[in-house]
Swiss-Prot record:
Coiled coil: none
Keywords: Cytoplasm, Elongation factor, GTP-binding, Nucleotide-binding, Protein biosynthesis
Record's subcellular location: Cytoplasm
One of the GO biological process terms: ribosome disassembly
Family stated for the protein in its record: Belongs to the TRAFAC class translation factor GTPase superfamily. Classic translation factor GTPase family. EF-G/EF-2 subfamily.
Annotated disulfide bonds: none
Protein function: Catalyzes the GTP-dependent ribosomal translocation step during translation elongation. During this step, the ribosome changes from the pre-translocational (PRE) to the post-translocational (POST) state as the newly formed A-site-bound peptidyl-tRNA and P-site-bound deacylated tRNA move to the P and E sites, respectively. Catalyzes the coordinated movement of the two tRNA molecules, the mRNA and conformational changes in the ribosome.
tr-type G domain span: 1-276
Full protein name: Elongation factor G 2
Keyword NAD part of the UniProt annotation: no
A cellular component term, taken from the record's GO annotations: cytoplasm
Length: 669
């Protein structure tokens, strides 16, 4: 049976979850259609999701259509949960990007599009909500072409528009498609194209052939010879163009009213790739080089842990894995190639949202979940012996907001830390630490909503009440200038007199460059590893108490005294040395700058812009969408706490906004 691993991506409220629920229902996996407003969707299973009507975690669903197994991951649309999108895209072979026919391309649409480009994921575009006032299919198609510099391939034209939208004309089949429900059973009927649509169908069929002929010699030849271009050839070439990311097939519908679902599922099977149609990149631990691995040829296990989820039912973590080659089964001896530790699967599951079906194995190209791993985290590679490869890990953005938390009862502090450990293991964008000055527990995340959801989980899922401080900005710090110095340590450490000198050069790097450590002197591998650990640990907190970013540390000399120095001593003293030298680099504090996209009624645009200017914001653009203006701007995150209330008041509740992290900038005051 063929497999499709697909993700459904979009801006919040574009209809991702509703579309996913319809696909699940139409493929027979569910016997009822979930509804977001009613809070009974299958993919949004967390209580917080059902309560808020948004997707927070990436739910995995397996269903079947026309002898094809489809693994669907419904991803969040809110920017606070970008990590869920990122780790989902890492393991997908194809995607559906959903656009609102009214709002078109929105802020998070651009974000997920860029993420999909990063992972080179072939996509379909689905223009949803065609029945809404202001729906404009062809404007959205034009925006996709102009904004994303891609070639949209229109496969359908609408029958009616807005409240009169009733179906589509399939350009490839030359048929009208009408959608209905009879006793809860979907019914798709075909009819001849009405006279009023024939001219437009001919025009778009010609456009379709013109686009395909840009990369298909076969279609070009048939066209030049004035021969009929068969349905099989057209579908095959659309598939080839989609997989190569030369084109983006575009479909439409209104998922809430069950219009357009069957053609969308057909297109998943017809145009998106199978896991066996693409080699995957890996790092060879034998040659220290990047390699391409063909899953058709390599039968040894290589799998990626892309998500860790705590189950309160079994009081254990469930590990979601994508198998790139070979097979997972309980008898297989495996190694975590990321840390060299041996692991074992005790149980294997097929996942259906928050329900699990135990199975015997997960084969090449498939997605499943396992129990029994002890030393693995998100992004780790699992292999069998003698398969020395490392898969590309999932990269996550830095947290930008922090908050102090303490339990109602001081006796619960240990338990609270244990809960934080559980959550941080499953959510790489959440972290916690203990303030050196106050002893308070500090949690960090991607935004106010992100932390709010976590605090709700602590109360509802773990039955623990906590007090919280106000949300604060999670700043960063970096070096203000180059500094070169030798740090001397001549003291007692762990009961031994130690004489140790280490010379470092600390240089500031450009924003976004990350931290780098290099050695200009010869050194034993064991000592080198200890020093690396010590300095890396020191990056966690600088002189202002914030993480240190964007610096280069060069070790140019190491001198040891007569007494033998332990690894732990090298590690600890290297951290002391770094902090001592870093203090002399005139450290600077950095604040997060956020990108904002504000949607406001036209009559309130002036007031919104004035408010942004007072906040020190920078306006990038103002564009019009019917009765609304779209304002794109940037502002310091510390100025944006409570902005939702300000906007709601200014626009009488009709305005909305999204924001996402852009970059760190030196804070001058």
């Amino acid at each position: 049976m063929s497999i499709r691993n697909i993700g459904i991506m979009a801006h919040i409220d574009a209809g991702k979850t509703t579309t996913t629920e319809r696909i699940i229902y139409y493929t027979g996996k569910s016997h009822k259609m979930g509804d977001v407003d009613s809070g009974n969707t299958i993919t949004d299973w967390m209580p917080q999701e059902q309560e808020r009507g948004i997707t927070i975690s990436s739910a995995a669903i397996t269903c079947h259509w026309k002898d094809c197994q489809i693994n669907i991951i419904d991803t969040p649309g809110h920017v606070d949960f970008t990590a869920e999108v990122e780790r989902s895209l890492r393991v997908l072979d194809g995607g559906i990007v959903i656009f609102s026919a009214v709002d078109g391309i929105q802020a998070q649409t651009e974000t997920v599009w860029k993420q999909a480009e990063k992972y080179e994921i072939p996509r379909l575009a689905y223009v949803n909500k065609m029945d809404r006032i202001g729906a404009d299919f062809f404007k959205v198609v034009g925006d996709i072409e102009n904004k994303f510099k891609t070639i949209p391939l229109v496969l359908q034209i609408p029958i009616g528009n807005e409240s009169n939208f009733e179906g589509v004309v399939d350009i490839i089949l030359n048929k009208e498609l009408h959608f209905s429900m009879e006793n809860g059973i979907p019914k798709l009927t075909y009819s001849q194209i009405r006279e009023e649509f024939i001219e437009k169908v001919i025009l778009f069929k010609k456009k379709l052939i013109d686009i395909l002929s840009q990369f298909s010699e076969e279609i070009t030849q048939l066209f030049l010879e004035d021969k009929e271009i068969g349905l099989d050839i057209i579908k095959r070439e659309i598939r080839r163009g989609t997989i190569s990311r030369f084109i983006i097939p575009v479909l439409m519908g209104t998922s809430l009213k069950n219009i357009g679902i069957e053609p969308l599922i057909d297109s998943i099977v017809d145009y998106l790739p199978s896991p066996f149609e693409k080699s995957f990149s890996a790092f060879s631990l034998d040659t220290n080089k990047k390699i391409l691995v063909d899953p058709n040829e390599n039968k040894k296990l290589s799998a990626l842990v892309f998500k860790v989820q705590y189950s309160s039912v079994i009081a254990s973590h469930l590990y979601f894995v994508r198998v790139y080659s070979g097979e997972i089964n309980p008898n297989k001896k495996i190694i975590n190639a990321s840390n060299g530790k041996r692991e074992k699967f005790t149980k294997i599951f097929r996942v259906f949202s928050n329900k699990n079906e135990q199975i015997d194995f997960v084969k090449t190209g498939d997605i499943g979940a396992v129990l029994g791993l002890k030393f693995s985290v998100t992004g780790d590679t699992l292999v069998e012996e003698n398969n020395n490869v490392l898969l590309e890990a999932v990269m996550f953005p830095e947290p930008v907001v922090l908050m102090s938390v303490e339990p109602e009862r001081s006796s619960d502090e240990v338990r609270l830390k244990e809960i934080f450990e559980i959550i941080s293991k499953e959510d790489p964008t959440f972290s916690y630490s203990e303030s050196k000055e106050t002893g308070q527990l500090i949690i960090s995340g991607m935004g106010e909503l992100h932390l709010e959801i976590i605090l709700t989980r602590i109360k509802d899922e773990f039955n623990l009440n906590v007090y919280t401080g106000k949300p604060q900005v999670s700043y960063r710090e970096s070096a203000g200038k180059i500094v070169k110095e030798v740090f001397e340590f001549n003291n007692i450490f762990a009961g031994k007199n130690i004489d140790f000198k280490i010379g470092m050069i600390i240089k500031p790097l450009s924003r976004g460059a990350g931290n780098k450590i290099d050695f200009e002197c010869g050194i034993e591998p064991v000592i080198k590893s200890a020093i690396l650990r010590g300095i890396t640990s020191a990056f966690v907190s600088g002189i202002f108490g914030y993480p240190i970013i964007d610096i280069n540390v060069s070790i140019f000399s190491i001198v040891c005294g007569a007494n033998k120095i332990s690894e732990s001593a090298f590690e600890s003293i290297s951290g002391f040395a770094f902090h001592s030298i870093f203090q002399k680099s005139d450290p600077i504090r950095l604040e997060p700058i956020m990108l904002l996209e504000i949607r406001t009624p036209i009559e309130h645009t002036g007031e919104i812009i004035s408010t942004l200017n007072v906040m020190g914001g920078v306006i990038h653009s103002v564009s019009n969408i019917g009765e609304y203006d779209l304002i794109k701007s940037e502002a310091a995150f510390e100025k944006l706490f409570g902005y939702a209330s300000i906007l709601r008041s200014s626009t009488k509740g009709r305005g909305s906004f999204t924001m996402e992290f852009s970059y760190f900038k030196e804070k001058l005051s």
